[in-house]
Amino acid sequence: MATMDFSKGHGTQNDFVVLPDLDVRVDLEPARVSALCDRQRGLGADGILRVARAGALADAGVLGALPDGVAAEDWFMDYRNSDGSIAEMCGNGVRVFAHYLKASGLESKDEFVVGSRAGARPVVVHGYDATHGDVTVAMGPIKDLGTSSATIDGRVFAGVGIDVGNPHLACVDEHVTAEVLSALDLSVSPGFDPGFFPHGVNIEIVTPIHDGGVHMRVHERGVGETRSCGTGTVAAAAAALKFDGRDEGSVLVRVLGGEVQVTVEGGEGSLRGPSVLVANGTISDAWWQSLV
């Protein structure tokens, strides 16, 4: 093929290159993914969302087996971090993925399942057009992994390990205000306990709940600081509720890229927020092949 189609989108400024690859012909070798996501030599993105049916990915050997609850006919979000590593789940990515399916005409229903390596994620597309979408994602179980800590700017932040399909360390600190949060240096990877998180961890620094909301910044494994992290907002909301002495509730989570609404109920989380599709185009196959 001479070119590859792509779309560029973001969920609260957590941005992605969307690659429709229904026949699973594109080789997402890490060096290629890294180049495509590079903001100087590629398109620039926090990650790549490959669009294909789960069964097609399994047949091609991309998936060893279908994850829990995912059927062969389900659309599957094959997510790659900007360094080329594979991630189990991305909440902002699912919103953009679902919006793309609707806007491109690949999906006709407003409620459907998106498969991920963390399992099936039911979505509801409340409204959309070619540019803007409003999507809720059922994020699945929220698992408390126990307490740990992160070191940022020479300061130790106590936090709770939370699994939302991928590992997080959400640190709620009573001394952290929005102003203190904005001054933190997240350009350097935070320190964490590799024995507690042997596969790395996404780290959130979170303010306590005030007027129903929190502020959050996040350092994502394999990426660095991003302007938003969907699973991170769920982890942050769950940790903030726990800090507030509650197991359930709704929290408005404010990130650098905007706001999302997280609801925690019955040990599971849901995430509602915007999606924006900003561009469509083609990638030169000659450039792509030169990356090998």
UniProtKB/Swiss-Prot annotation:
Active site per database record: 90 (proton donor), 229 (proton acceptor)
| Entry's Gene Ontology BP terms | lysine biosynthetic process via diaminopimelate
Sorted alphabetically, the Gene Ontology cellular component annotations on this record are: cytosol
Q: Which residues does the UniProt site feature Could be important to modulate the pK values of the two catalytic cysteine residues point to?
A: 168, 220
Q: Name one Pfam family in it.
A: DAP_epimerase
- Taxonomic superkingdom: Bacteria
Q: Quote the EC number.
A: 5.1.1.7
The residues forming a coiled coil are: none
Amino acids binding substrate: 14, 81, 91-92, 166, 202, 220-221, 230-231
Q: Which EC class, in a word?
A: isomerase
Q: What does this protein do?
A: Catalyzes the stereoinversion of LL-2,6-diaminopimelate (L,L-DAP) to meso-diaminopimelate (meso-DAP), a precursor of L-lysine and an essential component of the bacterial peptidoglycan.
Describe its assembly.
Homodimer.
- State the name under which the record lists this protein: Diaminopimelate epimerase
Q: Which organism is it from?
A: Rhodococcus erythropolis (strain PR4 / NBRC 100887)
What is the organism lineage in this UniProt record?
Bacteria, Bacillati, Actinomycetota, Actinomycetes, Mycobacteriales
